[in-house]
Amino acid sequence: MNKEKLIAFFKKETILCISGALAVVSAFIIPPDAGYIEYCDIRVLVLLFCLMAVMGGFQQLGVFDRMANLLLARARKMRQLATTLVMLCFFSAMFVTNDVALITFVPFTIMLLERANLREKMIPFIVMQTIAANLGSMLTPVGNPQNLFLYTISGMEMSEFFAVTVPYVGVSYFFLYVYCYFQGKQPLVTEKQEPKKQWSGNDKVFLLALGILFLLCLLAVFRIAPYQAIFVVILVWFIFFQKGILKGLDYNLLLTFVFFFVLIGNLGRIPVIRETLQNLLLGREVIVSFLASQFISNVPAAVLLSEFTTRYDLLIAGVNIGGLGTLIASMASLISYKYYAQAEGARKGRYMLYFTAMNILFAVILLAVNLFIPYLPVVHLA
């Protein structure tokens, strides 16, 4: 039974297990010493924790469900339904992360399409929601873990960050909208789904408090307020008022970051590896980070490659485009797949074919943007 549990854990947390094993192996090459203390970027870990906690609080209150219900009540045609479901993920991911957007809206989409007898739309809509969440999250530093990490270690100004991301996100929005538009004018009837529960007086107080905590998180991300103080405030709130949220956070993601911090720290102290990776990245930051993301996922790719280049603008572009491609290129994509695989009548093979085809299409489009628009700050491939 223990063996079965270990196998199940490995399947669920593959990246965590591999990163942990690699960190241990690297520790045999570079034995633990005082230098290890400098490996971990505490600010990144703290901000990730704070954002996950606040988003968990919003989710528990049903904020995102209510928002979806209000928007879906306006849908009268297939293209309107597609636009609503896809753009919900696209825009919400900019502020609540791609993971939270998909965890919230994919189950909602499955339920809605089942009730509306539109199962044939389940694969295309969920795949496009996944692409939309990954690309929408590219816009802001808080949209996904790799952005938060790279923005934090780079010291970039907000204007510099947006100069990198806005062109890609703008192009992504255009093509996502075109896709939704061509879903057609087929009339449909969608009923407004009542929230699971009405907000009580306490819920409203919690909602206000969480809104304030989210603003404090943003102040810390943008380096306006000290992250240490924000961490204390958020930790105290959740310990005393929403302790259950703390139990459900994705601590494995934080631990994965720690393992990769150790790994890249040790690799950086091995001269031959450091020189090889620096030479490999030089002038090829976008394509190398894109390809690395296909095999190890874009968050680990960002952490790993950041040690060997100072072109964080190119790295931001590469790992975000790198979220398109294989199912593991962005770990958020696995969330959608797992939800779909549990749906009645799921056709996993067809899902994978459609997922791969659409991801490749959008990846090619965005790589073309990188290559052929010379005024983009990230175009330094030669």
Whereabouts are the PLM-identified features?
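Hydrophobic transmembrane alpha-helices that form the pore/transport pathway of multi-pass ion
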Residues: 87, 91-135, 149, 303-317, ...
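Membrane-interfacial loop-to-helix junctions in multi-pass transporters
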Residues: 41-44, 73-86, 115-125, 204-208, ...
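Hydrophobic mid-bilayer segments of alpha-helices in multi-pass membrane transport proteins
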Residues: 4-29, 41-53, 206-215, 223-238, ...
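Transmembrane helical segments that form the transport core of multi-pass membrane transport proteins
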Residues: 39, 61, 65-68, 212-310
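Long, contiguous bundles of hydrophobic transmembrane helices that form the permeation core
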Residues: 2-4, 174-235
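Interfacial loop-to-helix junctions that mark the boundaries of transmembrane helices
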Residues: 5-12, 34-44, 156-168, 199-203, ...
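C-terminal transmembrane helix pair
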Residues: 162-177, 287-382
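Membrane-core helix-loop-helix motifs of multi-pass transport proteins
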Residues: 118-185, 190-197, 338-368
